[in-house]
């Protein structure tokens, strides 16, 4: 069973969102998603300054098995990316909820967070997979 931290919010497309408390939100892919993908070989991240809409493709995770689009769980401006992943994409596998984060977004409308799942609801969606 995948680890699903209760303090995070989740998109049904397997991204997680952590509120940093300053109007920005850190985004990554869930442990479940990285388990499905397998060993990461490359992560393509958005550019700092990019504006994204909720549900928009904004990054790509490439593994030994497949390339998978990553969607913005909320809309806003990309304010930081995890540059460490350029040289160490496998960090997504080893620490999906920590050092394997992908990007940070300044939310344009925090009410979009209400459309995301809590840990229990996300767990129920992956149980159905």
UniProtKB/Swiss-Prot annotation:
Bound cofactor: record note: Binds 1 lipoyl cofactor covalently.
Cofactor(s) listed: (R)-lipoate
Record flagged with keyword tRNA-binding: no
Matches recorded under PROSITE patterns: BIOTINYL_LIPOYL (PS50968), LIPOYL (PS00189)
Disulfide bonds: none
One GO term (biological process): glycine decarboxylation via glycine cleavage system
PTM-bearing positions, type N6-lipoyllysine: 65
Database matches in SUPFAM superfamilies: Single hybrid motif
GO cellular component, one term: cytosol
Domain Lipoyl-binding: 24-106
Keywords attached to this entry: Lipoyl
UniProt xrefs under InterPro entries: 2-oxoA_DH_lipoyl-BS (IPR003016), Biotin_lipoyl (IPR000089), GCV_H (IPR002930), GCV_H/Fam206 (IPR033753), GCV_H_sub (IPR017453), Single_hybrid_motif (IPR011053)
Superkingdom in the source lineage: Bacteria
HAMAP family the record matches: GcvH
Biological function: The glycine cleavage system catalyzes the degradation of glycine. The H protein shuttles the methylamine group of glycine from the P protein to the T protein.
Family: Belongs to the GcvH family.
Subunit-level organization: The glycine cleavage system is composed of four proteins: P, T, L and H.
NCBIfam families: gcvH (TIGR00527), PRK01202.1 (NF002270)
Protein name (Swiss-Prot/TrEMBL): Glycine cleavage system H protein
Lineage: Bacteria, Pseudomonadati, Pseudomonadota, Gammaproteobacteria, Alteromonadales
């Amino acid at each position: 069973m995948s680890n699903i931290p209760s303090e995070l919010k989740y998109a049904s497309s397997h991204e997680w969102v952590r509120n940093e408390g300053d109007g920005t939100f850190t985004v990554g892919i869930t442990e479940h998603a990285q388990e499905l993908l397998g060993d990461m070989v490359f992560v393509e991240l958005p550019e700092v300054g990019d504006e994204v809409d909720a549900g928009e493709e904004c990054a790509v995770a490439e593994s030994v098995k497949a390339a998978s689009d990553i969607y913005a769980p909320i809309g806003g401006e990309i304010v930081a990316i995890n540059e460490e992943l350029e040289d160490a994409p496998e960090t997504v596998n080893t620490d999906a909820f920590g050092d394997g984060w992908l990007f940070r977004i300044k939310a344009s409308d925090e009410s979009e967070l209400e459309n995301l799942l809590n840990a229990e609801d996300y767990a129920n969606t992956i149980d159905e997979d």
